[in-house]
Amino acid sequence: MNSAYHPPDMSQRIPGPAYSSSAPPPIHTYQQHQHPPPPLPPPSQHHHSSHPPLPPPPSAPHPHHQHPPPPPSHSLSSHQHHGQPPHHQPQPYAPAPYQQSQPSQYPRPHPHQQHVPPPSQHDEPPPPPSSGPSPTDHQKDSEYVPPSYSKIEEGSGWKYSLDVKQQPVRARMCGFGDKDRRPITPPPCVRLVIINTETGKEVDYNTLDHAMFVLSVDLWNHDEPGTPSYQQQSLPPSRESGYGQSQGMNYGQDYPPPVQQSYGPAPSYPPSSSYGPPQQYYPRHSGYSAEPSAPPPGAPFRNGYGQDQNALTRMAVVGGQPQGMFTRNLIGSLAASAFRLEDTEGQSGIWFVLQDLSVRTEGTFRLRFSFVNVGRPGGQGTNVNQGRAPILSSCYSESFHVYSAKKFPGVCESTPLSKKFANQGIKIPIRKDANIKGEGDEEMYDQN
């Protein structure tokens, strides 16, 4: 019984002397631990013998918890030099009561676990990439040019491609009236290139029959590849519109909206996921219901309107009847015939000139040109193809801007190519020299 009481007494004596300055004091204390008989030699405590030297050094418990490794190294080394291995075994008996509070505290302050700054370094890299690529992405969008498309014609083995020699630059919006139409300047001029796949050279354009060559054009947004240009309209949020879907779009409303919203450019072509050969699309008017209906499950929506995957059509409803008509954003001569013309270098070729194109709304757009041969393959005769005529080539123009009447800087000067074609009989508006006529800054045109 007396031997059982001695261990707590000895533990109280240990923190009293300060042996941090010299090694002998700890040896004296360990000799005192030998006097009490070791009636309890459990092996479990013997494993803790490596850790008990840690508690004696701290005079203040809290500051020394963070530095457990140094004391054990000095204490163990001192014991080994003095050659007292037996004193090293009875150590767990004295600090046993002190260990009851320590085991839970030792695993926490391990210095290796306190090095948390490395994760902070991983947090720093994410901000730079998020801020860095944003300007580069804008530059890529501005420099991006949609790819062109070309196809080899079956039967003839000719490969057709389009080359936009004269790009559109700017235009003035003409609104939704037809009285004040302003064409795109300069007029786009597209050259048709035909290569014989057998020889790898261009064909002789002087002997080629181009009467059945047709070029169509449509308007596309410059920053949204794969979507046609159209103007979105939305009703006030207080109005509840019905939904319905079939081949086109059905709308039903409890009360009619204002007539002003019935006018506006609507899409004329279905959107596609990527640039490719265009397909002509004619919107179909579907039924209209006066009672609102719920949208079908899984149907996508945009601005509160149901949207079909194959077509984008919108129509305002007044009293359950269609009030407005579909309106193109691009108006004018949307198809052009081919001409055999000479360029400024005197080389003959097949050209398409689109001098009568106007845009209703302001913005930045692109033109897409699509070439079709409606005649027999290979130019065999002038018979019209009674079946389907595939699109043999398509390309996109550079982006151009359409200004409002107040912001419009003026039409572009007539280019040498436009003047060259005008001299050959193509009706292109040519801007006359104002100084000769004495009209000042007034713009004058000569319709050839």
Swiss-Prot record:
Family: Belongs to the velvet family. VelB subfamily.
Phenotype caused by lack of the gene: Suppresses aerial hyphal growth,reduced colony surface hydrophobicity on solid media, and increases the ratio of macroconidia to microconidia. Reduces the production of fumonisins.
GN (gene name): VELB
PANTHER family: SPORE DEVELOPMENT REGULATOR VOSA (PTHR33572), VELVET COMPLEX SUBUNIT B (PTHR33572:SF3)
Role this protein plays: Component of the velvet transcription factor complex that controls sexual/asexual developmental ratio in response to light, promoting sexual development in the darkness while stimulating asexual sporulation under illumination. The velvet complex acts as a global regulator for secondary metabolite gene expression. Component of the VELB-VOS1 heterodimeric complex that plays a dual role in activating genes associated with spore maturation and repressing certain development-associated genes.
Ranges of biased composition (kind: Low complexity): 15-34, 96-107, 260-292
Pfam hit, one: Velvet
Region annotation Disordered: where it falls in the sequence: 1-153, 224-306
Main location per the UniProt record: nucleus
Keywords tagged on the record: Cytoplasm, Nucleus, Sporulation, Transcription, Transcription regulation
Positions with biased composition (Pro residues): 35-44, 52-61, 116-132
InterPro entries according to UniProt: Velvet, Velvet_dom, Velvet_dom_sf
Keyword Iron included in the entry's annotation: no
Subcellular location per the Swiss-Prot or TrEMBL entry: Nucleus; Cytoplasm
GO CC, alphabetical: cytoplasm; nucleus
Lineage: Eukaryota, Fungi, Dikarya, Ascomycota, Pezizomycotina
Protein name listed in UniProt: Velvet complex subunit 2
Oligomer status and interactors: Component of the heterotrimeric velvet complex composed of LAE1, VE1 and VELB; VE1 acting as a bridging protein between LAE1 and VEL2. Interacts with VE1. Forms a heterodimeric complex with VOS1; the formation of the VELB-VOS1 complex is light-dependent.
GO biological process: sporulation resulting in formation of a cellular spore
